[in-house]
């Protein structure tokens, strides 16, 4: 090594010289794999497995119980219903909320898995279409993580995924439940204000790939901005959808309202905001899956009623 701390690096100046040797202390070089136990799980691998396990529902009993108490499902349950079994490849699951000045890392790993955004690629309707046509991108906000709010790292994740969706022309299904921008993240690590392109990139997908918006529960502010860019909005009867949530309304001096009073379906469906209203969360996924199939190609097998009966729909005598 030719350099020391504080030295100026000049162009074409060698920094490190590497000498190639044929042996190690007179013995034969080996990578150690010949004698390694293939079933052994090293501590570093075990740590990785444990970290991934923290993101799964079976290891989040409190969040699951709280969600089920409201009659709602976990985001991963919706994804499991939507995609073909075993096909979901999650992107960046080990990130946590950028709140390191407020919480220790173990607390963040327990309470803010994936920074509240579960996302990745999967196969949808693979039993009907080939591998290429069944590929899709799934992005689901997780309301059990800080009310589904949008954090810095969740934005970085979405920036990457929306870029990939555009590059590979993947249809995108968005589960939008959440409270919009998150005010509690800190500036730990590299960070520049407004350095993400989530909203721009998502809106640029409009007209390029099918955008399917699905909502159950409360959807406000930034989450609503993404939902509004979708080609179709499928919502359950328990949904409330609005650009400004109760806190923003109260802060603006416009009164105090509960979340259920802001953008209920009794208002948004007649308004034309919601395209398809369904009864519950499970049905939103069923409809989204069926809607997506309309853009995935032609069915190899299908059936239809006898069309000849239509010949007799119009009466021969128009005045009878």
Language-model regions: role of each:
Residues 7, 13-16:
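Structural motif
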Residues 22, 176-300:
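Conserved catalytic cores of soluble enzyme domains
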Residues 1-7:
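Short histidine-centered loop motifs in beta-beta connectors
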Residues 104-107, 115-119, 155-161, 197-198, ...:
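Short alpha-helical segments and helix-capping/turn motifs at coil-helix boundaries
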């Amino acid at each position: 090594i030719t350099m020391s701390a504080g030295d100026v690096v000049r162009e074409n100046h060698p920094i490190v010289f590497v000498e190639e040797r044929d042996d190690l202390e007179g013995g034969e070089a080996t990578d150690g794999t010949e004698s390694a136990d293939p079933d052994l799980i090293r501590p570093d691998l075990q740590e990785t497995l444990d970290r991934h396990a923290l993101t799964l529902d079976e290891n989040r009993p409190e969040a699951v119980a709280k969600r089920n108490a409201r009659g709602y499902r976990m985001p991963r349950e919706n994804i499991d219903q939507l995609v073909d079994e075993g096909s979901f490849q999650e992107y960046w699951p080990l990130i946590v909320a950028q709140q390191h000045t407020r919480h220790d890392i173990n607390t963040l790993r327990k309470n803010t898995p994936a920074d509240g955004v579960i996302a990745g690629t999967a196969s949808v309707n693979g039993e009907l279409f080939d591998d290429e046509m069944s590929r899709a991108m799934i992005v689901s906000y997780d309301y059990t993580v800080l009310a589904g709010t949008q954090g810095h790292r969740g934005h970085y994740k979405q920036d990457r995924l929306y870029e990939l969706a555009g590059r590979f022309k993947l249809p995108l299904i968005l589960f939008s439940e959440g409270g919009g921008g998150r005010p509690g993240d800190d500036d730990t690590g590299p960070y520049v204000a407004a350095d993400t392109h989530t909203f721009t990139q998502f809106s640029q997908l409009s007209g390029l790939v099918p955008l399917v918006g699905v909502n159950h529960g409360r959807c406000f502010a930034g989450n609503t901005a993404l939902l509004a860019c979708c080609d179709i909005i499928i919502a359950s009867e328990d949904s409330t959808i609005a650009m400004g949530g109760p806190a923003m309304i109260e802060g603006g001096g416009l009164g105090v309202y509960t979340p259920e009073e802001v953008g209920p379906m009794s208002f948004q469906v007649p308004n034309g905001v919601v395209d398809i209203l369904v009864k519950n969360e499970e049905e939103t996924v069923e409809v989204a899956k069926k809607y997506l199939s309309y853009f995935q190609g032609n069915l190899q097998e299908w059936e239809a009623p006898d069309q000849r009966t239509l010949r007799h729909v119009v009466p021969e005598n128009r005045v009878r």
